Amino acid sequence: MRLDRRELAGALADIGVLVPIAVALIVGNGLSATAVLLPAGLLYLTAAAVYRLPVPVQPLKAFGAIAIAKGLGSDEIAAGALLMGVIFIVLGRLGLLDLAARGFPRALIRGVQLTVGLLFLKIAWGLVTDPPKSFSEHALSADWALPLALVTLVLAFALRDYPITLALVAVGAIVTVVLAGGEAAFGPSALALPSLDTATIVTAFTVLVVPQVPLSFANSCLATADAAKVYFGDQGSRVRPGRLATTFGSANLFAGAVSGMPVCHGAGGLTAHYAFGARTGGAPLAMGGLLLALAIGLGTSLAELLTAFPLPILAGVLATAGVLHILLLRDLRGARAWAFALFVGVVGFELNLTVALGIGLALWWGAEGLRRLPRLRPAA
């Protein structure tokens, strides 16, 4: 484990997903800023200790998007986090995810990673062309934001072997302070236990958990474990699907208990950390420490500060990670593998990842079964 400029630069590389969802949950859904960042910070520290590699922490993307779009309150979000925690701890501890992973061909996992890469690009585009409402006060028009995001993307891509994200985040922090103005209030925001009843739990399960479980299974567990092996070889064997499920499941039990932001791991985040220099557990250690410091030290004023962070910087870094994540497909060999990966990736992006994986698995193993059938031989 090390903590040098490269590790610190890599640690900051995945903020393009974290910041917009966190801000929307704080501003739009009324979650405590401290409760939003605490689970993410603690899971980063856990990842540093357990995996000793730059395993990422992200908000639950489908879960968060639905909660934001529907304006759900902290109780429904907390109930969903608790349910996600229970489901994935059980799946992880029973070894079911490690067993299921053996049935997923590499081509289909690459398809999942293609879906995630495309989603990163879509989110980045939306940040500058249709900014989230919570950022509207300080957002630039698309005429300015889009060129600035493209410049950020080019710089981030070309200089990713240097600590470019440190420079970009430093610029963003200066702009944030200037735009937010005034003096920051120090101290954590209040934490609250959720108030749960049957109706709240049923709503959380049907509206939030059911759409999220397949994505977390495919991306947070299978695709993240695969990406770790690609980037870190034998060291990546510590990053198993079942272990990933257990660590982020445990974090969600805590998130639910404090009415905070549900979190997971993610293959795209691993690419982001790795691409910008992270190679050890030092990156998640640094990021976890930063998030805890912000949650405890600036929780009362964090929402106002984060809404002023420049969206072109978030979009440019996120788009770079998306492009690099799509490049994982380079190791595919043969037309069949490419066809399956592209099918899962495009259908998962345009329609539904669960549907894409279901059809992909059925076609893959159906074809395998036909290939293994004994050929009929003419009678002698």
Task: Tell what function each PLM region has.
Residues 6, 13, 141-149, 162-164, ...:
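Hydrophobic, membrane-embedded alpha-helices of multi-pass small-molecule transporters
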Residues 16-22, 56-63, 221-223, 260-269, ...:
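Transmembrane helix boundary and interhelical junction motifs in multipass membrane proteins
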Residues 9-71:
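Transmembrane helix-boundary motif of multi-pass solute transporters/channels
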Residues 1-8, 183-195, 229, 233-237, ...:
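Intrinsically disordered, low-complexity non-transmembrane regions of multi-pass membrane transporters
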Residues 31-36, 52-64, 101-108, 262-269, ...:
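Short, non-helical or kinked segments that cap or interrupt transmembrane helices
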Residues 71-184, 286-380:
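Membrane-embedded alpha-helical modules
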Residues 9-10, 44-54, 156-157, 211-215, ...:
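Transmembrane alpha-helix interface/packing and boundary motifs in multi-pass membrane proteins
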Residues 2-8, 25-46, 210-281:
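Membrane-embedded helical hairpins/re-entrant loop segments and their flanking transmembrane helices
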